């Protein structure tokens, strides 16, 4: 079991506090493993496992706990038999109706430490904000980074070079369970295909009561085909009209929002760097795991430039950056990143194979006058840094401890 120290270092300061620890992210990205890692640390610090109460609400054994009252009664009864602080671990708690009322009551009435996971961003809106506002901390969990993937892959293929590891990562992606399948191609694709269907059905269709599943599937296919490309709801509506599907742009935006709430997609807004304002349209979208894209739709090798962008974008999120697409005049910067006032600029391209490409990628920074780090990231093996702009091979960039 990989330690996932990037996340544990953020969660650790809150272990044992009264704040509710909430872990969100796409289905099967490793949230349940985070609960096990927390239990492991608690045990190592002297907490007895008899103080743990763990419930996975996708397990039929707990199908009787589908309401807040039933769950409250169950936990109260079990807590009465435990000496000392009770540690509560609730996996996929969204399956319980009005669960936030139960959690708030347990927080108030018991000496407890609460950890919950969910696969939908709606968890932290609406009713939850009403009941738990200011009393929880959220941690978004992502599929494996390249570094995490390589650690596991080399436990299966110890002689794999860093280039071979990256080539495998490019196609397989970072879903943790693939290691159990030893990253074999056919089983891995089957697993990712079924996972995609599960996200689509359980976390999007069922949760949002979508009736027009065909429309949803067409929208998802369009967004996945256009990962990392700016488009508007109006342009997508025109595309669908050509396929004999007339749909309002507002409906399209709602469906895409549902996908983002299920962590299937991430929306990246555009920022006018000269006017210092967020632009209102033509956002970009990236997929939570590029391995899902390859398994379901294929084309990662043909769309290599966009997939490299997708990989870098997710790594920026993992490391805590807020990310926008930068526009300055007629030029675009792939990623403008901010973390507590510290900025970072990143351009991603496949290869710097021509003078035209070199001028385009490095020239995107011509009007940026600040002294924050600026990178061009590609698959090139040789350092082509110039004029204070750093060039890095994508593998080295992803594995670097910090960027400065």
What are these model-predicted stretches?
Residues 54-84:
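Short glycine-rich substrate-engagement loop in P-loop NTPases that contacts/grips substrate
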Residues 34, 38:
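Hydrophobic positions on the alpha1 helix immediately C-terminal to the Walker A/P-loop
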């Amino acid at each position: 079991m990989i330690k996932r120290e990037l996340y544990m270092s953020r969660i650790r300061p809150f272990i044992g506090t009264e704040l509710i620890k909430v872990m969100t992210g796409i289905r099967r990205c490793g949230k349940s493993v985070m609960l096990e890692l927390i239990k492991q640390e608690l045990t190592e610090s002297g907490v007895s496992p008899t103080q743990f109460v763990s419930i996975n609400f996708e397990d039929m054994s707990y199908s009787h706990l589908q309401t807040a009252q039933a769950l409250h009664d169950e936990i109260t009864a079990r807590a009465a038999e435990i000496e000392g602080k009770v540690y509560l671990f609730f996996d996929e708690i969204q399956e319980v109706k009005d669960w936030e009322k139960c959690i708030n009551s347990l927080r108030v009435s018991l000496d407890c430490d609460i950890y919950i996971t969910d696969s939908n961003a709606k968890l932290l809106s609406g009713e939850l904000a009403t009941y738990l506002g200011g009393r929880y901390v959220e941690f978004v969990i992502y599929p494996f980074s390249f570094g995490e993937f390589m650690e596991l892959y080399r436990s299966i293929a110890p002689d794999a070079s860093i280039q071979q590891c990256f080539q495998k990562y490019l196609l397989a992606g970072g879903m943790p369970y693939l290691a159990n399948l030893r990253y074999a191609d056919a089983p891995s694709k089957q697993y990712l295909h079924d996972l995609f269907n599960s996200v689509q059905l359980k976390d999007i269709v069922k949760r949002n009561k979508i009736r027009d599943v065909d429309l949803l599937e067409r929208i998802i296919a369009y967004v996945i085909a256009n990962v990392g490309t700016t488009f508007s709801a109006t342009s997508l509506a025109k595309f669908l009209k050509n396929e004999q599907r007339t749909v309002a742009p507002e409906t399209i935006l709602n469906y895409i929002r549902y996908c983002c709430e299920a962590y299937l997609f991430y929306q990246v807004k555009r920022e006018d760097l000269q006017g210092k304002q967020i632009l209102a349209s033509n956002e970009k979208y990236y997929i939570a795991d590029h391995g899902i894209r390859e398994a379901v739709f294929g084309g990662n090798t043909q769309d290599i430039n966009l997939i490299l962008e997708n990989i870098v974008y997710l790594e920026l999120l993992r490391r805590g950056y807020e990310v926008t697409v930068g526009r300055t005049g007629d030029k675009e910067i792939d990623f403008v990143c901010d973390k507590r006032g510290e900025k970072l600029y990143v351009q991603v391209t496949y290869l710097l194979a021509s003078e035209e490409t070199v001028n385009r990628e490095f020239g995107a920074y011509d009007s940026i006058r600040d002294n924050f780090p600026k990178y061009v990231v590609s698959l090139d093996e040789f350092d082509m840094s110039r004029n204070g702009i750093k060039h890095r091979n994508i593998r080295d960039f992803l594995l670097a401890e910090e960027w400065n």
